[in-house]
From Swiss-Prot:
Recorded name of the encoding gene: atpH
NCBIfam families, A to Z: ATP_synt_delta, PRK05758.3-2
Family matches, as PANTHER family: ATP SYNTHASE DELTA CHAIN
Protein name, entry field: ATP synthase subunit delta
Annotated compartments: Cell inner membrane
Molecular function as annotated in GO: proton-transporting ATP synthase activity, rotational mechanism
Recorded family membership: Belongs to the ATPase delta chain family.
Annotated source species: Methylorubrum extorquens (strain PA1) (Methylobacterium extorquens)
Coiled coil stretches, renumbered: none
Protein keywords: ATP synthesis, Cell inner membrane, Cell membrane, CF(1), Hydrogen ion transport, Ion transport, Membrane, Transport
Subunit structure: F-type ATPases have 2 components, F(1) - the catalytic core - and F(0) - the membrane proton channel. F(1) has five subunits: alpha(3), beta(3), gamma(1), delta(1), epsilon(1). F(0) has three main subunits: a(1), b(2) and c(10-14). The alpha and beta chains form an alternating ring which encloses part of the gamma chain. F(1) is attached to F(0) by a central stalk formed by the gamma and epsilon chains, while a peripheral stalk is formed by the delta and b chains.
Function field: F(1)F(0) ATP synthase produces ATP from ADP in the presence of a proton or sodium gradient. F-type ATPases consist of two structural domains, F(1) containing the extramembraneous catalytic core and F(0) containing the membrane proton channel, linked together by a central stalk and a peripheral stalk. During catalysis, ATP synthesis in the catalytic domain of F(1) is coupled via a rotary mechanism of the central stalk subunits to proton translocation.
Pfam families found in the cross-reference section: OSCP
Amino acid sequence: MAQNGSEGPLLAGVAGRYALALYELAHDQGQVDDVAKNLDAFDALYRESDDLRRLVRSPAYSAAEQTAAVGALLDRAGISGLAANFIKLTADNRRLFALPGMIRAYREKVRESKGIIRAEVRVAEKPSDAVIEDIKASLRDVAKSEIDLDLHIDPSLIGGIVVKMGSRMVDASLRTKLNSIRLAMREAR
């Protein structure tokens, strides 16, 4: 899988199908939010552990080895129920490599079902809680929908903000403004 989170059509298709099946099952059992919480807990473990990432990505481990290792991890982490069964199923089916994409696709399906729009926001330094709430309120007004804010700190922006919602992006960073000035000055010579 690509490091930047982009996926090829095969992986996106596998992830989407598995995520949709999980969502439909969770919805039928009234466990959509519980499954999301457990998947988020697993995703946090995945992001923090080099060993877990190796296990998930490596084709060197057999399905039985992956299932046993993941099962032990789920037990220790207190992840159970439908989410745990789903994660074990992906290991049994040799699809563990696609699990991060499945988790993203599941989150997107949950947001979609609740009418929530995801907004990626990049800023140069961590804003205060009040500023974060102001950003959310402004985006809520523009989108006319509830916002799920995904905040990233990117010091290379120098200042300002970059917002991406769906296919729209607004770059009001100081870095971009300085680059524009630099280009204008080159053309003026």
